[in-house]
């Protein structure tokens, strides 16, 4: 019964966490060497609301029950005080100035949340929840709503930076490349990380024109706007992170064949994606991948996370001879599709 009751209010935690992030509560707490009371935290906010400390206390009390912050009672004044829990390492800015916080805000943004109200109708009547909500595909919408586009890109960019940093600790497949194309590379955050470790690589950041218009200039990186279903820039290797999962088999095959044509004989596509378990379990890794899969249902026609066998079938159908799964970073796997088996 208690679990069912918790499920009934499951939306509360992510929305409260979003508010805490937007108020900078976690950053404020993490910036201090000692525990902080709600009143002390409120003093760092641009507010004259006399009820702010009480509201902050209630927000943080909830977050403490999920081990996002720690809570204790200070003996000198009998007030609850708060400090960062271990997970705050990933919810507050790291030495690179990024965290998962932007992704939390993006995932709970009004634009994406509206999709869920159309999922039932999509199951019964067909169609895509996002399209039902806004009358157009998600990426067409973001081309028009630049504010939401920036929120989405910030979430993806920060998360990408953290994922690729972890990948670079173990994956060695970028060694020896002279050029690398990041297809769907957003504003270039991922490619920047790769080139910071392999500065001799010439980077091409390839995405839709409205995406790269906000991309900052980076040394060694050329931003190219275009449509990956028409053609892909040429390079020694092509990197794609969370791209295949947006599209159905037919669309993925078209994209992968364009990649195949853009590669030299010894070229390869390097894919970073979740790999779905054939049968899910209750582990965090399994939950993350199946959650991502259902999120995609609300946004894209035919998009989905895939099992290892499904990825291999796609690679072979597109003409790639080699297929190998390498390391994973926070459940994001690196998979290579080699144009020739000798690669």
From Swiss-Prot:
Q: Does the keyword Transferase apply?
A: yes
A GO biological process of this protein is: flavonoid metabolic process
Describe the reaction catalysed, as an equation.
3',5-dihydroxy-3,4',7-trimethoxyflavone + S-adenosyl-L-methionine = 5-hydroxy-3,7,3',4'-tetramethoxyflavone + S-adenosyl-L-homocysteine + H(+)
* Pathway info: Flavonoid metabolism
Q: What is its EC number?
A: 2.1.1.-
Pfam entry (one): Dimerisation
The way its activity is modulated is described as: Inhibited by nickel (NiCl(2) and NiSO(4)) and para-chloromercuribenzoate.
Q: Heme as a keyword?
A: no
Q: CDD domains recorded for this chain? A: AdoMet_MTases
InterPro entries named in the record: COMT-like, O_MeTrfase_dom, Plant_O-MeTrfase_dimerisation, SAM-dependent_MTases_sf, WH-like_DNA-bd_sf, WH_DNA-bd_sf
Q: Where is this site: Required for cosubstrate binding?
A: 286
Q: What class of enzyme is it?
A: transferase
Q: Catalytic center at which residues?
A: 245 (proton acceptor), 273, 305
What are the GO MF terms of this UniProt record? O-methyltransferase activity; protein dimerization activity; S-adenosylmethionine-dependent methyltransferase activity
The entry's S-adenosyl-L-homocysteine-binding residues are: 184, 207, 227-228, 240-241
What keywords tag this UniProt record? Methyltransferase, S-adenosyl-L-methionine, Transferase
Q: Which PROSITE patterns match?
A: SAM_OMT_II
Q: What does this gene product do?
A: Catalyzes the 3'- or 5'-O-methylation of partially methylated flavonols, but does not accept quercetin or caffeate as substrates for methylation.
Subunit relationships? Homodimer.
Q: State the similarity comment.
A: Belongs to the class I-like SAM-binding methyltransferase superfamily. Cation-independent O-methyltransferase family.
| Name the record gives this protein | Flavonoid 3'-O-methyltransferase FOMT
Q: Which organism is it from?
A: Chrysosplenium americanum
């Amino acid at each position: 019964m208690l679990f069912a009751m918790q499920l009934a209010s499951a939306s509360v935690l992510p929305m409260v966490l979003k508010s805490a992030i937007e108020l900078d509560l976690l950053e404020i707490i993490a910036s201090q060497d000692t525990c902080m009371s709600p009143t002390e935290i409120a003093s760092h906010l641009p507010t004259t609301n006399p009820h702010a400390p009480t509201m902050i206390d209630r927000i943080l009390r909830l977050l403490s029950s999920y081990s996002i912050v720690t809570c204790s009672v200070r003996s000198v004044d009998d007030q609850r005080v708060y400090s960062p829990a271990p997970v705050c390492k990933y919810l507050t800015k790291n030495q690179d100035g990024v965290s998962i916080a932007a992704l939390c805000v993006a995932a709970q943004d009004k634009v994406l949340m509206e999709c869920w109200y159309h999922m039932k109708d999509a199951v019964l009547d067909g169609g895509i929840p996002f399209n039902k909500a806004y009358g157009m595909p998600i990426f067409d919408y973001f081309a028009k709503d630049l504010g939401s586009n920036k929120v989405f890109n910030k979430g993806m960019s920060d998360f990408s930076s953290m994922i690729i940093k972890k990948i670079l600790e173990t994956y060695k497949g970028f060694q020896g490349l002279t050029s690398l194309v990041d297809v769907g590379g957003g504003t270039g955050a991922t490619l920047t990380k790769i080139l910071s470790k392999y500065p001799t690589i010439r980077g091409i950041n390839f995405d839709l024109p409205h995406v790269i218009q906000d991309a900052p200039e980076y040394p060694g990186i050329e931003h190219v706007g275009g449509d990956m279903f028409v053609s892909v820039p040429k390079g020694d290797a092509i990197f794609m992170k969370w791209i295949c999962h947006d599209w159905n088999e037919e669309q993925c095959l078209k994209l992968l064949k364009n990649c195949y044509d853009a590669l030299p004989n010894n070229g390869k596509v390097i894919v970073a994606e979740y790999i779905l378990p054939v049968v899910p379990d209750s582990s965090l890794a399994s939950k993350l991948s199946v959650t991502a899969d259902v999120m995609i249902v609300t946004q894209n026609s035919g998009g989905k996370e895939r099992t290892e066998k499904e990825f291999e079938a796609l690679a072979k159908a597109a003409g790639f001879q080699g297929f190998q799964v390498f390391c994973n970073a926070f459940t994001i796997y690196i998979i290579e599709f080699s144009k020739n088996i000798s690669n």
